[in-house]
C-alpha cells in the first residue's frame, strides 16, 4: 500500500481501513501462533500499513489544527484592525 494513496483518502475511510488492517493483523498473528501460516512476512507488511494509515491520520489532524489556529488568528487581526 503506497503512502500517497493513503494520504488522499478521507478520515472516515482511513478509520475504516485501520479497523480492517487490525482485524487482518489479529488473524495473521493467530494463524502464526497455531502454525497455520506459511508466509510470516505478511505480519510485518500489515503492521507497516497500519503505521502508514495512522501517520496519515495524525498528519490530517495536525493540518486541521493549524488551519483552525490560522482562522482564529485572522479573526483576531481583523478585530484589532477595527478597533484601531
From Swiss-Prot:
One annotated GO molecular function is: structural constituent of ribosome
Gene3D superfamilies under this entry?
Answer: 1.10.287.310
Superkingdom, according to UniProt? Bacteria
Key words, A-Z: Ribonucleoprotein, Ribosomal protein
Q: Which GO terms describe its biological process?
A: translation
> Where does the record place a coiled coil?
none
A single GO cellular-component term on record: cytosolic large ribosomal subunit
Look up keyword Ribonucleoprotein and say if it applies.
yes
Q: Which family does it belong to?
A: Belongs to the universal ribosomal protein uL29 family.
Q: What protein name applies here?
A: Large ribosomal subunit protein uL29
Whichever gene encodes this chain, its name is rpmC
Amino acid at each position: 500500500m503506497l503512502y500517497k494513496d493513503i494520504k488522499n483518502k478521507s478520515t472516515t475511510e482511513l478509520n475504516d481501513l485501520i479497523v480492517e488492517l487490525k482485524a487482518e493483523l489479529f488473524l495473521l498473528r493467530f494463524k502464526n501462533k497455531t502454525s497455520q501460516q506459511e508466509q510470516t512476512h505478511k505480519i510485518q507488511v500489515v503492521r507497516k500499513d497500519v503505521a502508514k494509515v495512522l501517520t496519515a491520520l495524525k498528519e490530517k489532524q495536525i493540518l486541521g489544527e493549524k488551519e483552525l489556529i490560522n482562522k482564529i488568528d485572522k479573526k483576531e487581526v481583523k478585530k484589532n484592525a477595527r478597533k484601531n
